[in-house]
Swiss-Prot record:
The keyword Transit peptide does not apply. It is a multi-pass membrane protein. Belongs to the major facilitator superfamily. InterPro entries: MFS_dom, MFS_sugar_transport-like, MFS_trans_sf. GO terms for cellular component: membrane. It is found in: Membrane. GO terms for molecular function: transmembrane transporter activity. The chain crosses the membrane at residues 11-31, 97-117, 125-145, 149-169, 187-207, 209-229, 283-303, 326-346, 354-374, 388-408, 423-443, 452-472. This is Uncharacterized protein F23F12.3. PROSITE patterns: MFS (PS50850).
């Protein structure tokens, strides 16, 4: 018996998911294309009203605009869109934050649209179309003649990110075994994707070439998708049993094992294909599934605010820009190992604890950062002990936020029946994208008062922790196929016969 029953087909699925995450890192591209270089004045005799380190970016812009005739753009580690389109100060600086917001609006729209398409037309074709669109428009964004055109193209790229995180994620998850889910998120994860994404941006050094190169990272997925079958679980929900059997045979061949038809399949009758179009309304067709949608969706919202708020603000912190980004990505990747080890050796470490423990540590980290920022700063050097402490604590906090994401994705994937799984994950993702809309504005507000993002993150994090402690379901080890055989909801006279393999309750 192989480790976690992993075969060569599962390995292929793992790598496909990693390439999908390479493209999903478009959501942190604002860290790079929105990078604001330092500003100073070359006028003789010009001095700021107080030491520059004690001025916010908005105050620096105000003094330069009022008293300086010859601005100096300081050397930057990455040539951003801000430099090309002169979006340093005033309303133009706010417009640069809006570009990221528009990108997140695209992800919000994509979550709503692709979730429904994935459940109706199938995981494979919708994933192929969504990823293809993302690559094409991502490459095109590198040639944008204005920031307005760039924003429109990023809106479309945002929809494709949603397709990957919802439909493609469900597609991959329906191919692998329950015991492999944590393995997937441990060794093929956002941290490694972020490392590669940051490396590409470092090599390119310019937002246009980086936009093209990072979009092409997902290209290897497309030819493999053409070769792979549709998800048998999706076929089963549509009562397309013959096609399901053919898909299973191909998967067996790809896995290098003999196809063995399940005993309960031999007596299945050919039924009429399920032509019902499921919508978001089906998530509220019964109390158990509505309960799950509300609870899990609220956690996605809060985690998104915390995650993207901290991520997009990381470019505003002192210290070496690329070193901070590389260390942050590596810390995220390595922190995922703890999930796998806990899941493997401590079976009682369930989905609830996977969310709550990192959440508590994250709140502690950002409360500490908030206190450090509010306290008087006697050291103007970016290498000072105070700024170094903020960077280190921020990296730790960001790593633990990513662990709460794992809990959110695992619970969402394990709680919804196949026929509405991508709608369920899509709805959760929709709520997450609404939360993410706040992130660019939080990063902009940090230019006015640096502690603001951390005040928001800590406040929302505490509410999220309380919801998790009292209401989060535990879904560890759930058989996705069993969710279809024993659905979470029944309507009409059968409501009293509701059956669920998921225990809804507190720790």
């Amino acid at each position: 018996m192989s480790f976690l029953n992993i075969n060569r087909f599962h390995i292929l699925c793992f790598f496909l998911w990693q390439f999908g995450l390479f493209y999903a890192c478009q959501l942190i591209f604002p860290i790079f294309y929105n990078f604001h270089p330092g500003l100073s004045c070359e006028d003789p005799g010009f001095n700021f009203s107080k030491p520059k380190c004690k001025l916010s970016k908005v105050e620096i812009c105000t003094e330069l605009t009022a008293n300086c005739s010859k601005w100096h753009i300081e050397p930057a580690p990455f040539h951003s869109m801000v430099q090309d389109f002169k979006m340093f100060c005033g309303t133009k600086a706010y417009d640069s934050a809006w570009i990221a917001t528009i990108q997140f609006i695209g992800a919000l729209v994509g979550a709503l649209v692709y979730g429904h398409l994935g459940d109706h037309f199938g995981r494979k074709p919708v994933s192929f179309v969504g990823i293809s669109i993302g690559i094409i428009f991502g490459v095109a964004s590198g040639f944008a003649p204005s920031w307005e055109v760039f924003a429109v193209l990023l809106f479309i790229c945002g929809t494709s990110v949603a397709c990957i995180m919802i439909v493609f994620y469900a597609y991959i998850l329906e191919f692998i075994e329950p015991e492999q889910r944590v393995f997937l998120r441990t060794f093929f994860n956002w941290g490694y994707a972020r490392l590669v994404f940051t490396l590409v941006c470092f090599i390119c050094g310019y937002w246009r070439s980086a936009a093209i190169a990072t979009s092409l990272l997902a290209l290897p997925i497309l030819p493999v998708l053409l070769w792979l079958p549709e998800s048998p679980k999706w076929y089963a929900t549509k009562n397309r049993f013959q096609e399901m059997k053919e898909a299973e045979k191909k998967i067996s061949w790809l896995s290098g094992i003999s196809y063995v038809e399940r005993e309960d399949r031999r007596t299945e009758k050919i039924e009429e294909k399920d032509t019902k179009v499921y919508t978001i309304r089906d998530l509220f067709s019964s109390w158990p599934i509505a309960y799950s949608t509300i609870v899990v969706g609220s956690l996605w919202f809060s985690t998104s605010v915390s995650s993207f708020g901290a991520d997009l603000n990381s470019g505003n912190l002192a210290g070496n820009f690329y070193l901070s980004q590389f260390v942050q990505a590596a810390a995220i990747a390595l922190s995922k190992l703890s999930i796998f080890l806990l899941d493997l050796f401590i079976p009682s470490f369930n989905r609830q604890r996977l969310h709550q423990v990192p959440q508590i540590i994250m709140i502690a980290c950002y409360t500490t950062i908030m206190a450090l920022m509010i306290s008087p700063d006697s050291d103007c050097s970016s290498q000072g002990s105070r700024n170094l402490a903020i960077i280190i604590i921020n990296i730790i906090g960001t790593s633990f936020i990513e662990l709460t994401w794992d809990a959110c994705y695992l619970v969402a994937a394990e709680i919804f029946p196949t026929r509405i799984r991508t709608i369920g994950i899509g709805t959760c993702s929709l709520l997450a994208r609404i939360g993410a809309l706040l992130a660019p504005q939080m990063a902009y507000l940090s230019e006015i008062y640096p502690p603001i993002p951390y005040i928001i993150v800590c406040s929302i994090g505490i509410i999220s922790l309380l919801i998790s402690c009292f209401f989060l379901p535990d879904t560890k080890g759930v058989d996705l196929g069993a969710l279809d055989r024993n659905p979470l909801e029944e309507s009409g006279d059968n409501k009293e016969e509701e059956i669920s393999e998921i225990q809804i309750g507190t720790n």
